[in-house]
C-alpha cells in the first residue's frame, strides 16, 4: 500500500476539486485504476442498520405513526434478538416524527436501537437532547461539490462547522455519527482524512465513540481490485482504519443503487473493515434506492455461515404489508420478496422441480422465507409444469406427489392449451388452476359435491371437458 503523509489540516484549496477526469458530467463517469493492493480486513462482528424511516421514507408518501410502529415491530421480530439489525434511524422534525419515536421507545426493544438524524446545526441538536436519544447522525458533506457549490463554504470553514457540532454532541453525552456525504467524489486525503483524524481526537478527549458513516450519495463507489480513489470502496474503508485509526465498530457504509452496485459495494465495505451497513426495507429510497436490508441479511448469512436466530419469514410479512397497506408495488422479480422471485415458468425447469425442487430453487424458500417454490402455468409449461404446479400449490410430498404421466394431468393440459388457442396471453391464475385441478383430482377437492371429471373420457373427447368446465367454473380470459 502506498504511504501517504497524513496530518490533521485540510488542504484548503481556492477552487473546488471536481475530479473532471473521472466525472465529466456530459459523459458516463470513469473508473480509474492505480492498482493498489488493499488487504481484506473483515471485522469479527458485523451488523446491519436500518434507515427505512429516514432515507427510505423520503421517496414515498409519509408513513403514519401507526405504520411506523408496525414496521418497527416487524424489524424487531425479524431481528429476533440476534442484534444483526442493530439500529433504526429516525427524523425528529415534525410532531408526527417525534410521536412515532416516542411510541417506538415505549416498546422497550433492545434491537433495533433508536437513533436520530440531524443537519450540522445546534438548533437541530436540541431536538435530539429533548428526545433523550443516545446517538444521532449529523450531516457532514465532504465533497467539494457540496462544500463549494451547495454550502458555499471553504474546506476549512466546513471542517470547523462539523467539529463544533460533534463537540457539542459529545459535551451532552450523545454519540455523534458523522455522515460524510458524497464521499465517493471527495478529496480523500485533502479533506476526509484530516476531518476524521480530528474527529478521533475529539473522541479520545471525551472518552466517547465518534462514529463515521461513509455515504455513497450517488452510488458511484466501485469494488474492483485496483480501483483508485475517490471511488474505491476498499481504499475508503482501509483509509479509515489505517490512516485515521477508526475502530471498525465505529464505521458504517451507506450506499445507493444508481449504478446497480449497492449490494456488492456494501458487502465489500464489510470485507475491508466496516462493521455496519446502512439499509432500508425493500431498498426504498431516493432515486434508485438504498441497499435492501433483506439482501444484506442474506449476505450476512453467506459470509458468516449463520443468521443466528433471525426469523426471515417476517420478510414475507413485511412485503405483504408494503403492498397491501402502504400501496407500494414491489417489482415481481425482486429477490427474496418479489411475487415471482422463486416462480418457475420454463417447462424444462418445471420438470427439474418435479424431480427435486433443489435443482432449480436457491435454497429452501418454504422453510426460510415461508415462500414455497412455485411453478407458473402458461402455454409453454407442458405436463411437467402442470404436475409441478399441482405438487407445489397443494404441498404434496413423497408418495402423494402427482406424476406428470398421470392421465388427469393431460386433462388439465388440454384445458390450458384451449385457453391459449382461444387467444389468451397471460399466465393461468392460481385460482383458476385450483378450480380445474379440484374438479379433475377428486382427492384434492375439499368439496365432495363437486363434479369430478372422468379423465378417460376427457382425454379423447375435449368437448366433454368443456361442458364440465362451463357448468362448474367461471374462467376469465385475461
Q: Where are the language model's segments positioned?
A:
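N-terminal active-site wall of soluble small-molecule enzyme domains
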Residues: 92-117, 121-127
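Catalytic alpha/beta core domains of metabolic enzymes, predominantly
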Residues: 218-354
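Hydrophobic faces of well-ordered beta-strands that scaffold small-molecule active sites
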Residues: 48-51, 86-90, 112-118, 136-138, ...
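Alpha/beta enzyme core
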Residues: 65-83, 122-138, 142-151, 155-177, ...
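Glycine-enriched alpha-helix->loop->beta-strand junction motifs that scaffold or abut catalytic
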Residues: 107-111, 130-135, 208, 268-276
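Conserved, mostly hydrophobic/aromatic
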Residues: 56, 136, 178, 212, ...
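Active-site beta-loop-alpha junctions enriched in small/polar residues
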Residues: 54, 91-95, 117-121, 141-143, ...
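A mid-to-C-terminal "edge-of-domain" accessory segment
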Residues: 4-54, 305-478
